[in-house]
Amino acid sequence: MSALDAAEAALAALHPRPYPLPLGRLAPVVEGAFQGFGRTGWVVCGPRERVGATLRGCPVERLVLAASGARPYKLAPCSEAPGNRALHAVGLALASREAVLCLLGTASAASGAFYEACNVAGITGAPVIFVVTVLPLDDRAPVGPQLAGAPAALASACGLAAHTVAPGEIAAAVSSARASARPTLIQVNLE
């Protein structure tokens, strides 16, 4: 059992709120993103991805309430609107003048707030790193396609560095993006 699996099991036993959200196929994305980003700098993510903060030394007890941050570990509180996370990350990057990691999914990228965040990051050069996970949709999905194009294409159009990587390449891509100190979107396609 990996450290992330153990942390996820410990968090589930504490009955996190709003409700337990298992990582499932997102585990390598979360692990790679947190490992590549390191222990310093703010992280903005959803309730599901918060367990990655344990890789920074955050105790699982600090992760029970998704709406609460874990300040000593630079984990921002979760926004109820997924797309707003991108705006919060850009704001944190501009205010701190340090790299900020933001974990998003397709629903976040389909939000107008995501476009606004990419636009502001492109204009200002905010050192934000968006990691956007794209899952394939089949007939069992509760919704149809949410994006007309790829998140990496939208980010590139806004002036961000944009890369599409496999799950095993996330840590290196995040580390490289952090070293570049420029706004970057890393798209991860899960098959």
Where are these regions (language model features)?
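Generic recognition of stable, solvent-exposed alpha-helical segments in well-folded globular domains
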Residues: 2, 28, 116, 168-172
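A generic alpha-helix structural signal
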Residues: 7-11, 33-34, 118, 174-177
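Short amphipathic alpha-helical segments, especially helix-boundary/capping motifs
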Residues: 10-11, 66-69, 129-131
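Cofactor-binding active-site loop characterized by glycine-rich and histidine/acidic residues
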Residues: 16-125, 145-159
